[in-house]
Amino acid sequence: NPVLDARGGPNHVGNFCGAPIMIDLDTKQVYYTPIFHILSQFSRTIRPGDAVLTTAVNSSQLPPDALHAVASINADGLISVQILNTGPAPITLGVTLDKHNAVITMPANALKTIQFNLAL
């Protein structure tokens, strides 16, 4: 469910769930959770019809599961690389695509998108 109340309902099994948007029915406050912002970023840079590209993350110097990446390309040749740092510390990394290179620093617990335009 994209929207749930502060207790994670309503749902059909009576357990507690999270959602992109949570609403406190008592105070009428709306909370946009981190997953809302992640989905928002993905939906702006990965569109229907885009193709997923093979990505490789060389993270042998990092804790397991600290760094994740996925890339896509659209019909205009724009490549979007989504990078997620799940660790508690910033990570400086290089991103290479053919002749394009970028060195970026990922803040702790952050998602970042970098884009390359192959048409340029």
Question: Which residues are covered by each model-predicted region?
Answer:
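Substrate-binding and catalytic surfaces of secreted/luminal carbohydrate-active proteins
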Residues: 1-120
